[in-house]
From Swiss-Prot:
The keyword Lyase applies. The keyword Lyase applies. Its EC number is 4.2.1.41. This is Probable 5-dehydro-4-deoxyglucarate dehydratase.
């Protein structure tokens, strides 16, 4: 897949980030992960992001990462494109990007670097080093301490033709509007706030109709139904699902830091597709919270 092909894929449809399966002892469970992807692939996502934030990229080892990407590519070949997460320190991000390209992934999402703040010049050097280390497409992730200005992105796009996407996880409406107006159709734009459905209609109004759904991991039919409602400006369906599921879901998710990932694994277990525990420093949901989530799931997608 060429970078332009990746941009085209990222320009329409619903995206998702599968959780990563672990055994009870925390080791990567390749068989469980393959079975998960086989289950999710037919539901209609435009692409799946392996080893992304929801896939606990931040807790993976250098030896596990290629296994995870290779499992995803092998399982989904001919079914749905696989985009790999890559990030952290520049040299490690390059190692991951090159490993993903070797495994046959169709591109990478370049996630935030680790811990330290950086100037726009430093961010640009980081992105350019990764872009020039691979031939396939790169999507940058605007989130946390990694925040790009339109001017920085414009310079990067001039120098790196394989930079084809911009994912926003900040939620700065003015900043996102400025980016879209500055870059136009040079990039594909993705909404990437946690529980992106809550913000999907607003992002669509800004020219960003594509977003990634975490709940696709356990209620894929409902996730697709909500996406279609946004796509078709069906406000009645959007509001009903926000009322019945997404807003109460946020109350559970917001009970503890790190639950944005933990709640997804809990949901997968509830619907019969368990992925094992989250890795520290994350913590699994409490029994009471799991029952609260199960009740919400029964309202929209009975098990």
């Amino acid at each position: 897949m060429t970078p332009q092909d990746l941009k085209n894929v990222m320009s329409s449809g619903l995206l998702s980030f599968p959780i990563t399966d672990f055994h009870d002892n925390g080791d990567f469970n390749a068989k469980g992960y393959a079975e998960r992807l086989e289950w999710l692939a037919p539901f209609g996502a435009s692409a799946l992001f392996a080893a992304g934030g929801t896939g606990e990229y931040f807790s993976l080892t250098a030896s596990e990462y290629p296994q995870i990407i290779q499992t995803a590519v092998n399982t989904c070949r001919g079914k749905v494109p696989i985009i790999a997460g890559a990030g952290g320190p520049t040299r490690f991000a390059i190692e991951c990007a090159q490993a993903a390209e070797k495994a046959g992934a169709h591109g990478i999402l370049l996630m935030p670097h680790y811990m330290t703040e950086a100037s726009q010049e430093g961010l640009a050097a980081h992105v350019e080093a990764v872009c020039k280390s691979v031939n396939f497409g790169v999507i940058i992730y605007n989130r946390g301490i990694t925040r790009y200005t339109p001017e920085t992105v414009a310079r990067l796009c001039e120098r790196n033709p394989n930079l084809v996407g911009f994912k926003d996880g900040v939620g700065d409406i003015e900043g996102m509007a400025s980016m879209f107006l500055a870059m136009g159709d040079r990039l594909a734009y993705l909404g990437g706030l946690p529980t992106a459905e809550v913000y999907a209609a607003a992002y669509k109004a800004l020219g960003t109709p594509v977003y990634s759904s975490a709940v696709f991991n356990f209620i894929p039919k409902t996730a697709m139904r909500f996406y279609e409602a946004v796509k078709n400006d069906d406000q009645a369906t959007q509001h009903q699902l926000l009322k019945d599921f997404f807003m109460p879901y946020l109350k559970i998710r917001n009970r503890s830091a790190g639950y944005a990932v933990s709640i997804i694994k809990a949901g997968a277990k509830i619907v019969g597709h368990p992925a094992g525990p989250v890795r520290a420093p994350l913590a699994d949901l409490q029994a009471e919270e799991i029952e609260m989530l199960a009740e919400l799931i029964r309202k929209v997608e009975p098990v």
